[in-house]
């Protein structure tokens, strides 16, 4: 029976994630709430669900670390870390051989180089442009009139490499519509956009330097086509955690434990990780992944 | 901070934020011309020696509208802002303009001023950028003479060596006062915020130097040293021609950093070098141009004996800065060309650094915040003495 509990909360641009660890760094629960936009209620729901799954109350949490764009909104937060540090920490714990993290979230993408200790060595991120982020895939799905969860499977069926020159998330929609108007197969359009986005990500990778041991995290890593085309662009296989979206919150929870206890968690323990994976899968309720009625439908 | 310090600082901030108001008041009071100076190397003592007020033209915070039709969007924000100010009548207050620097974008904006304000003299002499050539020194001396002749012509006032020397002395005194404040910051005194320091420099670029020095003395007389705290120490580097937005400074400090040194034009670079009072004044002004590049090398100058990266490494040693924030004005060609060299040096010496590209309009605050905080976390987590425990977080 654990005597101390630690929480990591990642409030991103489109989802809120919460992970609870015990004092042995074992994952007790992890929860994701799809919000569509930064939402205090969505974050509260992720926290409440994670606490409920772990069978503990907020008062039982010894230390909480917030991360993501909304990190300062996290209640009871001990301190905050950027998602760069947290994704690096989470990945380093699960993949000791990792040297590079490609994290593509709802509104930004980051490439993080890790040193031998798993600490951030260098990083690059998009700043003014949503190209290549989750938002871009949402634009694609909307233009193709399909659900965001279907766009990857559709892209995997594409066989032609069509010219997609616009990398602006706003203007891309008109280019996609134009291709469809010319009679292009939606699968080819989806594949071509994925391919173009992958090359955009390659630019970020080049900024910190490509290296072996690449792990992809963030919500976009759930899209098999995004992973496939990025691997093709990199000419290199990547590893993807079973739930890549939770990696920032997991890293934050690890940091909460480490800062609170003053000890570094260095041992890779598959059992602890398994808990993370299974719990996350169990909480992946289609209801809480829709936009934006996920919150109202949970009430 | 005492009452006098606050008042004096408030005046300096007010001038920095609203140069037009100060210039209008100065003109009304003195009935003398005001000459607009383009950055970076024009020796303002020449203008001051005529009795006129030299004012280094500042970037306006106003969004660029009319200026967009005058200069292409790939001109830097500062030069487009000058074009915009010229189009909106904001430069009408100046009686003439002088420029000594051959930046192609700056020359574009000078041309706009010349075109839109045809009745105002606009004078350009190029202070040669190749510092080592055998003919450079002679040519710079000739250019200084040409500036003096033009300043006499425009203002109708002859320039004596005595008047030049007096202006050199007042500028040196002003620079020395400012350098004392910057040296105190470098040595661990955090009594003034980066925004306050920038206001001191920018107001010096606008105001009569004696008046400015008097205010500075008032600020210093009442100032109380404030020991540096445990925040991560950063050096700000770049921005050769104009002031970065103070919002950026505030964001950096909000992220848990303290700026301990810089090489910004509106910072240490502007006050780096005095003009020698022991030399004949005209020669001393030419000498200042060369000496300045040796004190803080500028990537727009070519000099084999000095380079910016070596200077930067030395500056980091002196201030104890743990990282470098490179602030690059978008489309600044000189900076863009030099930056890979700088990055290579910083990487070789394992110095954390972050490039922030600035634009005239819009600052992606949250993404910059994330990048700066990530850099600070990287420095903290890699330094055993910087590890934060729950108790100290």
Annotate each language-model stretch with its function.
Chain A
Residues 32-36, 52-85, 112-113, 121:
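Short beta-strand-loop/turn "lid" adjacent to the catalytic site in phosphate-handling enzymes
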């Amino acid at each position: 029976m654990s005597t101390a509990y630690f929480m990591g909360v990642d409030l991103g641009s489109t989802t809120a994630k919460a992970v609870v660890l015990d004092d042995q760094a074992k994952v007790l629960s992890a929860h994701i709430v799809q919000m569509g936009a930064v939402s205090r209620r969505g974050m509260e729901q992720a926290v409440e669900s994670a606490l409920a799954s772990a069978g503990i109350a907020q008062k039982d949490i010894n230390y909480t670390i917030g991360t993501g764009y909304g990190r300062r909104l996290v209640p009871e937060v001990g301190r905050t870390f950027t998602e760069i540090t947290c994704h690096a920490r989470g990945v380093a714990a699960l993949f000791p051989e990792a040297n590079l993290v490609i994290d593509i979230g709802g509104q930004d993408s980051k490439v993080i180089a890790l040193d031998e200790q798993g600490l951030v060595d260098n990083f690059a991120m998009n700043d003014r442009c949503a190209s290549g982020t989750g938002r871009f895939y949402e634009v694609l799905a909307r233009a193709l009139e399909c659900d965001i969860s279907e766009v990857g499977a559709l892209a995997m069926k594409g066989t032609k490499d069509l010219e997609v020159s616009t990398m602006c998330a706003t203007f891309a929609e008109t280019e996609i519509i134009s291709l469809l108007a010319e009679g292009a197969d939606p699968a080819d359009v989806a594949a071509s956009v994925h391919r173009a986005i992958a090359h955009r990500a390659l630019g970020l990778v080049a900024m910190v330097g490509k290296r072996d041991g690449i792990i992809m995290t963030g919500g976009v890593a759930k899209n098999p086509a995004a992973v496939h085309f990025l691997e093709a662009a990199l000419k290199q296989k990547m590893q993807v955690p079973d739930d890549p979206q939770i990696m920032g919150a997991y890293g934050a929870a690890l940091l909460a434990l480490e800062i609170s206890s003053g000890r570094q968690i260095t041992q890779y323990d598959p059992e602890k990780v398994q808990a993370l994976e299974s719990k996350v899968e169990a909480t992946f309720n289609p209801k809480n992944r829709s936009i934006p009625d996920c919150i109202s439908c949970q009430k | 901070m005492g009452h006098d310090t606050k008042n004096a600082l408030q005046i300096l901030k007010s001038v920095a934020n609203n140069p037009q108001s100060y210039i209008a008041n100065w003109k009304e009071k003195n009935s003398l011309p005001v000459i607009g100076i383009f950055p970076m190397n024009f020796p303002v003592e020449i203008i001051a020696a005529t009795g006129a007020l030299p004012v280094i033209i500042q970037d306006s915070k106003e969004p660029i509208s009319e200026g967009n039709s005058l200069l292409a969007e790939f001109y830097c924000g500062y030069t487009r802002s000058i074009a915009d100010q010229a189009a909106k009548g904001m430069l009408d207050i100046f009686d003439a303009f002088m420029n000594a620097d051959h930046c192609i974008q700056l020359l574009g904006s000078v041309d706009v001023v010349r075109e839109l304000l045809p009745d105002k003299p606009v004078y350009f002499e190029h202070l040669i950028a190749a510092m080592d050539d055998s003919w450079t020194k002679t040519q710079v001396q000739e250019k200084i003479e040409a500036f003096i002749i033009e300043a006499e012509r425009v203002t109708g006032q002859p320039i004596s060596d005595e008047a030049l020397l007096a202006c050199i002395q007042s500028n040196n005194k002003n620079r020395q006062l400012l350098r004392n404040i910057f040296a105190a910051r470098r040595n661990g005194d955090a009594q003034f915020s980066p925004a306050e320091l920038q206001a001191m420099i920018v107001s010096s670029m606008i105001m009569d130097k004696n008046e400015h020095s008097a205010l500075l003395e008032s600020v210093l007389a009442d100032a109380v040293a404030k020991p540096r705290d445990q925040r991560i120490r950063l050096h700000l580097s770049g921005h050769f021609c104009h002031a970065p937005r103070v919002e950026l400074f505030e964001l950096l400090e909000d992220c848990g950093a303290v700026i301990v040194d810089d090489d910004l034009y509106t910072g240490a670079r502007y006050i780096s070098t005095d003009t020698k009072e022991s030399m004949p004044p005209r020669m001393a002004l030419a000498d200042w141009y060369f000496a300045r590049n040796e004190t803080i090398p500028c990537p727009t100058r070519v000099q084999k004996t000095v380079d910016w990266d070596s200077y930067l490494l030395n500056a980091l040693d002196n201030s104890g800065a743990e990282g470098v924030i490179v602030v690059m004005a978008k489309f600044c060609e000189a900076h863009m060309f030099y930056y890979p060299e700088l990055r290579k040096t910083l990487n070789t010496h394992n110095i954390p650094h972050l490039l922030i590209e600035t634009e005239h309009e819009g600052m992606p605050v949250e993404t910059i915040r994330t990048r700066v905080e990530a850099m600070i976390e990287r420095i903290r987590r890699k330094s055993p003495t910087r590890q934060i425990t729950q108790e100290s977080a």
